[in-house]
């Protein structure tokens, strides 16, 4: 008979005591194209005519979902999800898990957890039957939001059984079979009130034994899975194998390593630079590595900020997700992008530009705000590269300036069609300025300009990094336009090679093997 973890630890089982949302409205399509166009019009924050929806709940969800990190209104998040769910439940759920997916998707926690809580209270059976999938795409602390939902008891049972399994592996010396559950389980003596609350819910359930048993279980398992936090707390610096640290831990605790183990840590970084050892960066976003510079005084434009060797090493170690494309990166540096969205925009621009396989467009970007400029990524350090493309123009969002710049140069030099960029990746919050023709959308005006100049329109990739309103630059009827969202470049190759219309691209991402287990 399988023993409980309290029995395994030899401790007494003394128990520790102490409304639905409407779907986002996707305008119904009439048989009349003019009526469809009129019903779907709205305006950006800067007064530009645009589309309220792509005319597909799935595409709207995909385009906004991974860019909602700063959205305070949970009803908007759930509304977008429900519009997609009403259109195709399986695709909506797969997109939700793609948004959360730490390794192959966008790694967004909050949006996933908001929707997971809603599902727990409104699609309880589905959540219960798929509890095991949550940790596969996210982390074990994602389960904690379910402790205040209709799935509370089932979640507690699931976590308790996993903890028992891990302890069985511990006592059988099967350490490689132990999950990361113990790393993310809440401690009742934590500093965070929310963490304390979750720990109390677990301990008062009667499924985790006494507080003493619970603490001992977590302590044993955390030692087995070799989490660096335990070694830091115990001041066991010489026992830390830096080459085995997870990506985020290597970045987060770098200053502690310098303070307490400087000589050995510096030698490790030298070995990384020489190719003798590796440093992990596979779960980091490019913006994670720009923030240590951008948060310094005048960090974006100052190439002489304090250079961080850990950041530099991890930037070089980032996986290369950029496919072979004949294209240019265009990044929004307007005032509304200040803060994290600006970091995401600049970091993705530098990341894509320097990994661009095109001999012509490699290391070139076009930042835009009130005007657009050609910029070349230059420098040896990441700080120098960021400074080389930062313009300091943080005013309005004149997207048309980008295309005016490209077409004016092309016409003046009689550039043939085959030498024009085939892709343009536009990284922005999508709050574009009004066109010179106020009755046309930015996309319509861009199409007009290319036609007037005698060039074919390139494939336009609108990459949403900060969704504040339900508006989109294109609809599903616009061919040659791809809509993405989020801060991770992990999906670039699939997205840019997955098709020529939005639904084809989304299907190529969420209908692959990685998300095949997610069914409704």
Residue ranges and their predicted role:
Residues 2-344, 354-520:
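Long lumenal/extracellular ectodomains of secretory and single-pass membrane proteins
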């Amino acid at each position: 008979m399988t023993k409980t973890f309290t029995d395994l630890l030899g401790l007494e089982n003394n128990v520790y005591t102490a409304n639905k949302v409407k779907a986002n409205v996707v305008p119904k399509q009439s048989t009349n194209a003019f009526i469809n166009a009129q019903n779907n019009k709205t305006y950006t924050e800067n007064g530009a005519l645009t589309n309220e929806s792509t005319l597909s709940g799935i595409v709207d969800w995909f385009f906004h979902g991974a860019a909602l990190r700063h959205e305070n209104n949970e009803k908007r998040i759930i509304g977008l999800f429900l519009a997609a769910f009403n259109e195709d439940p399986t695709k909506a759920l797969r997109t939700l898990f793609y948004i959360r997916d730490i390794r192959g998707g966008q790694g967004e926690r909050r949006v996933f957890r908001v929707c997971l809580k809603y599902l727990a209270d409104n699609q309880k059976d589905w959540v219960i039957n798929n509890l095991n999938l949550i940790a596969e795409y996210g982390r074990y602390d994602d389960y904690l939001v379910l402790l205040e939902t209709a799935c509370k008891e089932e979640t507690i049972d699931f976590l308790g059984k996993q903890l028992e399994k891990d302890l069985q592996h511990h006592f059988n010396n099967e350490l490689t079979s132990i999950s990361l559950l113990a790393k993310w389980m809440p401690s009742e003596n934590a500093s965070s009130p929310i963490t304390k609350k979750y720990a109390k819910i677990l301990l008062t359930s009667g499924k985790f034994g006494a507080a003493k048993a619970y603490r001992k279980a977590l302590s044993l398992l955390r030692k087995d899975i070799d989490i660096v936090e335990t070694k830091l707390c115990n001041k066991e610096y010489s026992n830390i194998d830096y080459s085995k640290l997870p990506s985020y831990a290597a970045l987060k605790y770098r200053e502690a390593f310098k303070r307490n183990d400087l000589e050995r840590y510096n030698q490790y970084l030298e070995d990384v630079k020489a190719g003798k050892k590796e440093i992990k960066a596979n779960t980091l976003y490019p913006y994670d590595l720009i923030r240590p510079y951008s948060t310094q005084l005048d960090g974006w434009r100052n190439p002489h900020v304090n250079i961080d060797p850990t950041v530099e090493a991890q930037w070089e170690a980032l996986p290369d997700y950029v496919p072979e494309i004949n294209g240019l990166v265009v990044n929004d540096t307007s005032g509304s992008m200040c803060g994290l969205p600006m970091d995401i925009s600049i970091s993705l621009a530098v990341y894509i530009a320097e990994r661009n396989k095109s001999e012509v467009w490699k290391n070139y970007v076009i930042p835009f705000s009130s005007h657009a400029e050609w910029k070349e990524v230059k420098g040896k350090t990441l700080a120098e590269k960021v400074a080389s493309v930062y313009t300091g123009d943080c005013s309005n969002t004149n997207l048309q300036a980008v295309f005016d710049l490209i077409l004016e140069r092309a016409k003046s030099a009689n550039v043939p069609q085959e030498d024009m960029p085939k892709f343009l990746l536009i990284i922005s919050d999508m709050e574009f300025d009004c066109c010179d023709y106020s009755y046309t959308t930015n996309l319509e005006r861009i199409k007009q300009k290319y036609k007037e100049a005698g060039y074919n329109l390139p494939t336009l990739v609108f990459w949403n990094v900060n969704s504040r309103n339900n508006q989109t630059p294109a609809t599903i009827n616009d061919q040659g336009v791809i809509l993405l969202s989020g801060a991770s470049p992990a999906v670039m190759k699939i997205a840019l090679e997955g098709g020529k219309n939005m639904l084809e691209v989304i299907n190529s991402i969420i209908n692959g093997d990685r998300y095949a287990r997610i069914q409704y």
